[in-house]
Amino acid sequence: SMLLLLICTITAQAQEYHVETPGTLQEVIGPGAEELTRIRVTGTLNDRDIAFLHRLCWPSKPKPKGMKYENYLKMAMEKEDTLKPCLRYLDMEDARMVNDALPARAFDGSFIRDYKLPKTLKKIGESAFTCNVFLKELIIPESVEEIGRNLLFFSIKVEKVRFPDNLEVMNDFLCAECWKLKEVNIPSKVREIYSGIFNGCPKA
């Protein structure tokens, strides 16, 4: 049982990778990336690294045109256990993004259950966490000043979102169709709130 305990502890710990040169995360991780369930990344990342991370937590194909979102989500959730890649926990807290910006659709449709975002992040592109069907909580770092529209659109299990106090503009549909959302803050510095932020959120 001691051995079993040891194995469980090892599995629960995140593998750690340091990126010295932006754009080289794939080379730093090397073979076997698709087997990883938890990783912690430090150093400096660019959009190429984010695209690679996205592939590691994005087993479903993009939503076909014309398919209803509900049907797409159902299909994605049914496939979770049958498809690799396996990444479910991603800690980027001590990494830095080039330009301090997360690109649009960075983790659209991903199967991540827990993100820790870079604590120096200033901007999050639109639809960054759309259709994240297993995510329950998203804490956005206090450093973030700008968030694109559709942030968590159809992330149907999200219960809690924490926006940074310095956010001045809340863009369209930030949390639309987050059916379980019940805990969310309106930042103290907000001066503009756009439409449909909490559309389809009966509990928010």
Features from the language model and the residues they span:
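Ankyrin-repeat helical core positions
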Residues: I29-G30, D108, F153
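Short, intrinsically disordered, low-complexity terminal segments
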Residues: T9-T11, G125, C201
